[in-house]
Regions:
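Sec-dependent N-terminal signal peptides
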Residues: 4-13
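Lipid interaction determinants
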Residues: 18-93, 97-158
């Protein structure tokens, strides 16, 4: 009887974790793993003293030619992140693990990053990755390119 109760408790505790594994549906997973990746729009963090800071290159507005960042998540659970700031480029690669709405990275040096809480909005084609210290807002790269083209047409009509 005691063993049965232990198994019952273990099964009961495991239910939320089993359900959490499928936080994204099939279409959302396809979007998350889009081959074009995700453009980093904004990146902000809370310092230890509690004052939020915003990275000047990633302030929510496009800065083509000055800075850009793209995160690509593949179906084989690998990632690549390329950040360009004023002609300098930094690339990071590794693996990622998605467990429910938690996304964690391990880069090529074995450095662990995360887990981040993942919020994907399929309608706006946007992605938010956040944990207490940092928040990143991303847009599907193909949508970002469309947005830049539309902005260019508005700013420079023929």
């Amino acid at each position: 009887m005691r063993r049965f109760l232990v198994l019952l408790v273990v099964a009961f505790i495991s239910i939320p974790f089993a359900n959490g594994r499928n936080a994204l549906n099939t279409d959302e997973m396809k979007m998350l793993q889009d081959s074009g990746g995700w453009e980093i729009l904004s990146m902000s963090k809370n310092q230890v003293n509690g004052f939020p800071t915003q990275h000047p290159c990633f302030d929510g507005r496009p800065h083509p030619g000055q800075c850009s960042g793209v995160l690509i998540l593949t179906k084989s659970n690998t990632f690549s992140q390329t950040v360009r700031i004023q002609g300098q480029s930094v690339k990071r690669t590794g693996t990622y693990q998605l467990n429910g709405d938690q996304l964690a990275f391990v880069d090529e040096l074995g450095t662990q990053d995360g887990p981040y809480t993942l919020t994907l909005n399929a309608q706006t084609k946007s992605l938010i990755l956040q944990m207490p210290q940092i928040r990143m807002e991303l847009m599907l790269e193909s949508e970002y390119r469309k947005m830049l083209e539309e902005q260019k047409k508005r700013d420079h009509p023929r």
